[in-house]
From Swiss-Prot:
It comes from Bdellovibrio bacteriovorus (strain ATCC 15356 / DSM 50701 / NCIMB 9529 / HD100). The gene is efp. Involved in peptide bond synthesis. Stimulates efficient translation and peptide-bond synthesis on native or reconstituted 70S ribosomes in vitro. Probably functions indirectly by altering the affinity of the ribosome for aminoacyl-tRNA, thus increasing their reactivity as acceptors for peptidyl transferase. GO terms for cellular component: cytoplasm. This is Elongation factor P. One of its GO terms (molecular function) is translation elongation factor activity.
């Protein structure tokens, strides 16, 4: 059983008999009255988003989900294709099922696929991934204002704010929980 104090991004809970994943949450302690938790949830079966508020201390069941480690293979018209390293079984997932995880998938990336009632419903990516910059404006020599950033589009389509010295072809480490630039791994 989980309580509202256990909430974190990515936590899976049962609500009204359906499995949900917590997309975002905020613990609120008003000056007057009891504290509560405001959440944004995504239904793991339908992909629908739900905003809900829970009283402090409310309890939730843990959904019966099975985790399988798989590798991302490729994307085609059937969806995003993954393969189990143990059984070599292949599955395809839609963009809706993947949600934000689709922006972090690169060939052969090891991920954890969540199954609920034998259906792939979600994909957990590593905490940080390395992505190549596909497009960004060139950095101008001498243009080094402290903390300044520019937009960069990664190989997967993700747009990230990066420091001015980053160029196309650079490999960057991206935090998958926030979608933000962490560091440059290698230069072109």
């Amino acid at each position: 059983m989980y309580e509202t104090s256990d909430f974190r991004k990515g936590l899976k809970i049962m609500l009204e008999g359906k499995p949900y994943v917590i997309v975002d949450f905020q613990h609120v302690k008003p000056g007057k009255g009891n504290q509560f938790t405001r959440t944004k949830l995504r239904n793991m079966l339908t992909g629908q988003n739900l905003e809900s508020t829970f009283k402090s201390g409310e309890k939730f069941e843990v959904p019966n989900v099975e985790n399988k480690e798989m590798s991302f293979l490729y994307k085609d018209d059937t969806g995003y294709n993954f393969m189990s390293q143990e059984t070599f079984e292949q599955i395809a997932m839609s963009e809706e099922d993947l949600g934000e995880a689709k922006y972090y998938l690169t060939e052969n990336l090891k991920v954890v696929i969540l199954f609920y009632n034998e259906k792939a419903v979600a994909c957990d990516v590593p905490k940080a991934v390395n992505l190549t910059v596909a497009q960004t404006d060139p950095g101008i020599k001498g243009d080094r204002v402290t903390g300044a950033t520019k937009p960069a589009t990664m190989e997967t389509g993700l747009t990230v704010g990066v420091p001015l010295h980053i160029n196309e072809g650079d490999v960057l480490r991206i935090d998958t929980s926030t979608g933000e630039y962490v560091e440059r791994v290698s230069q072109k």
